[in-house]
Structures are given as C-alpha cells and as structure tokens.
Amino acid sequence: MDITQLLAFSTKNKASDLHLSAGLPPMIRVHGDIRRINVEALDHKQVHAMIYDIMNDAQRKHYEEFLEVDFSFEIEGLARFRVNAFNQNRGAAAAFRTIPSKILTLEQLNCPPIFAELALKPRGLVLVTGPTGSGKSTTLAAMVDHLNERSYGHVLTIEDPIEFVHESKKCLVNQREVGRMTLSFASALRSALREDPDAILVGEMRDLETIRLAMTAAETGHLVFGTLHTSSAAKTIDRIVDVFPSEEKDMVRAMLSESLVAVISQTLCKNKEGSGRIAAHEIMLGTPAVRNLIRENKVAQMYSAIQMGNGFGMQTLDQSLTDLVRRNQISNAEARSKSKIPENFPG
C-alpha cells in the first residue's frame, strides 16, 4: 500500500490518526484505541519514501536539519491531514491526524448553546483547552464557522500548520501558517493588530510573548480564540499567570480579569455504542464573580463558582459527564474514568 491508499483506508475506517513507524506495520487510532493494519511491517526506507513524497522542498530541508517537521497537506476528495514526521530508534516515523474536509457545526458536535453565543462576542479572550487529541481544533473551527456564517467581519487565523480551511462566507477569512506565511505566532500577532481583524484565532498560545500579545489584542477590542494544553479552567488561569515573571503577575491577573470571556476545557469520551466519541466540557465564563477571583488570585475557589454558575451557562466537567450519562450517551464507567472526582460515579 502506498501513502494515499493507507490514508484512504484510515479515513474509511473513521480513524483519527494514522501512524507509520519503521520496523512495524502501519497503525490507526479508532475511537481512541491504536489498532494494527493487517499488512507487513514497513522498513526505514519505505517510511522515509512515503513521508518524503508528500513534503515540499522546504519541509524536506527542515526535516533533514531538525530531524522532525510539522506540516499539513490535502488529498483531493478525501481529507486534509496534519503531519508530524520524526525519527525514532528503528528509523523514520510519522503521525497523520485526519482533518475532515467538512467543518462540523456546533449542533453536530453537540456543543452547549453557550458556544454559539461566545462565537459572536464582539471582543475578549475565548480559550478552548484540553490534552492533545481532545478535539480543540474541531470545536474552534465550528465556532469560527458559526461566526463566518452570521457576521460581517475580518477573521484572521494563525496556525501551525493550517488545519481546517475556511471559505470566506459573510466574513473575510485570512489564514496564516507559521513557518510558511509568517515566522512565528508572536510576529503574526504583532502584525495582526495592523491588519484590521475583528476576530483572531491563535492556534497555540505556547510562549510568554504570544500570550501577552493575545491578551493585548483581546483588551484592545478584538475577539481572540486561543488554545492551551490545560485540563481545567483553574489550571488554565494558573498556566497563563505562571508564564510571566513574578513582578508582572498582578498586572497579568488584572489584564486577564478584564479580557477573559470564557475558558472551555474539554475531553473526549467513548460513546455507549462504542461507535465514536463525544466531548464533555467544563465551561467557565468571565462573570463578575470569576473576574474578581482571577484578580484576587483565588483560583482554588473557581470550581465552586463554576458549580454555582449554571444559570449563566457554566458547568463543571462532572456536571457535563453526569448529563451525558443521564442522556444515555456514555456509560457510568466511562464517566468515572474521565472524572476528576471518580467517586461521583460509583459502580
């Protein structure tokens, strides 16, 4: 099988990822589980040739120099794929993440109604967080698409690499890829403020300068969507503040308390039939009470504020899991495995 056939097989079997690793057969991840494809093991030369075939010259040069590279590419009529090519102890390797060619709607993703409201906010910082593979990009793509269909504005995305491709509908959408169309998230964000955007998507807020610029953009009247690899709203606030030196922390808390609109922390759960996965969400909104907790560094009290904030559209992860169990969408055992307080789901 060549790389196109392997990716077609992967997509047909609803796999989220395809893994190539010298010395082993290709493997796919289906509903969270890794499974081997029933073909012979690939050697280093085969894997190397497969990934070289889909790289451009700049990507090959980067791979040779740094021994790993991130990029995305599309197979017409099949899907887009986000690729990380690297080396391991048996030779060449690569991980391919499937990016559906069609952007799912917030309704198709079973997102709570508050997501649609957040996508249309005029300004502020909306963060979608969670571990790798938790569907952050899919959720953000749906939110941007919701905005694109309902508002006349300029949406600017900064990604590494570009994942979902947005057509300009009611909005003008410009997508920039780090490494190909801009040197870094920070340099693209600095330029963004002179490019007349209404909304900015920052694919990953991974360093101090990017976080500072994203908060500044939100503070100066832009809607900013961003992602972090944190597992809860409280940890997200801590992570942002901890990036800054001690003498700036109070100022950052003040900035964050003014600009934060929402933190959505999500995790994917296997559905009851075992035929797919569904997201559970912790949702924290920038209510006056939450803003005050951020300003006064009372992060430990955020869980209680979220618990009590149902009327505003807030929910804890356990409240989301309980709702999914009640609606018979996930099992009690699955909820227990994802919960931060497993004893809430006895059995």
PLM region descriptions:
Residues 1-347:
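Short, flexible helix-loop junctions that flank or precede catalytic/ligand sites
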